[in-house]
From Swiss-Prot:
Underlying gene: psd
Species in which this protein is naturally found: Beijerinckia indica subsp. indica (strain ATCC 9039 / DSM 1715 / NCIMB 8712)
Top-level taxonomy: Bacteria, Pseudomonadati, Pseudomonadota, Alphaproteobacteria, Hyphomicrobiales
Primary residence: membrane
Protein name: Phosphatidylserine decarboxylase proenzyme
Its membrane topology: Peripheral membrane protein
PTM description: Is synthesized initially as an inactive proenzyme. Formation of the active enzyme involves a self-maturation process in which the active site pyruvoyl group is generated from an internal serine residue via an autocatalytic post-translational modification. Two non-identical subunits are generated from the proenzyme in this reaction, and the pyruvate is formed at the N-terminus of the alpha chain, which is derived from the carboxyl end of the proenzyme.
Pfam families for the chain: PS_Dcarbxylase
Keywords: Cell membrane, Decarboxylase, Lipid biosynthesis, Lipid metabolism, Lyase, Membrane, Phospholipid biosynthesis, Phospholipid metabolism, Pyruvate, Zymogen
Length: 232
């Protein structure tokens, strides 16, 4: 392995969505430094924080079709049965839902919780309430995906929050996503909801720490061999 490749493996990459923001903070830092050097230090701290926010670390993802992986870094804020957003067309009955709240200090790159085909993507404008509130699922700006596989249909909803005002979704209808694959990003604090079909059993509780692409949120099977993993 070359020295450059070794360094690249040690340094956490920055997601391209963050480049304009980091560049803006860097320019502001130069201007502030020219005006008054102490302000330049504040600008430098803000620039470093922005780079930290848009970090995009590689993850070790379990490869098992029966499990559901966390789509986001953060804290599990809700586990239970809730009505899915009507625009997703997932039916008129409550579904098992697990919500992960992301603070401004969490990595905000979103990853697919399951492998499957994206059959629907629907954006809905809305409010910008605290994303940790239960009513934020229906009242806030959101972007929902339906992912279908042999286990059924899963709803994945990106929800904007008080600070987050920009939902980014890289996936398109018809795409085939693999578990842990990057599909979106929400800027500056938000939440991800995962709606699961019957037979999928939650394995986490409220307050649990979740890591996108790694933490197993739920499982369809109880007795099975240890899954393989993918790093990326």
């Amino acid at each position: 392995m070359s020295i450059l490749a070794s360094i690249q493996r040690q340094v956490t990459p920055i997601h391209p969505e963050g480049y304009p923001f980091i560049g803006g903070f860097a320019v502001a830092t130069l201007v502030l430094s020219w005006l008054w050097s102490p302000l330049g230090w504040l600008g430098l701290m803000a620039t470093l924080w922005c780079a930290y926010f848009f970090r995009d670390p590689a993850r070790l993802t379990p490869l098992d079709e029966s499990i559901v992986i966390s789509p986001a870094d953060g804290i599990v804020s809700s586990v239970g049965y809730h009505m899915p957003p009507p625009e997703l067309g997932l039916g008129a009955e409550p579904m098992q839902r697990i919500s992960v709240f992301m603070s401004v200090f969490d990595c905000h790159v979103n990853r697919a919780p399951v492998t499957g085909r994206v059959t629907k993507i629907v954006y809905r404008p809305g409010l910008f309430l605290n994303a940790d509130l239960d009513k934020a699922s229906m009242d806030n700006e959101r972007n929902g995906l339906v992912i279908e596989n042999n286990n059924g249909r899963f709803g994945v909803v990106q929800i904007a929050g008080l600070v987050a005002r920009r939902i980014v979704c890289f996936a398109e209808k018809g795409d085939h996503l693999t578990t842990g694959e990057r599909f979106g990003l929400i800027r500056f604090g938000s939440r991800l909801d995962v709606y699961m079909p019957e037979g999928v059993r939650p394995l986490v509780g409220v307050g649990a720490k979740a890591v996108a692409g790694e933490t197993i949120l739920a499982d369809r099977q109880t007795d099975k061999p240890r899954p393989a993993f993918r790093y990326g």
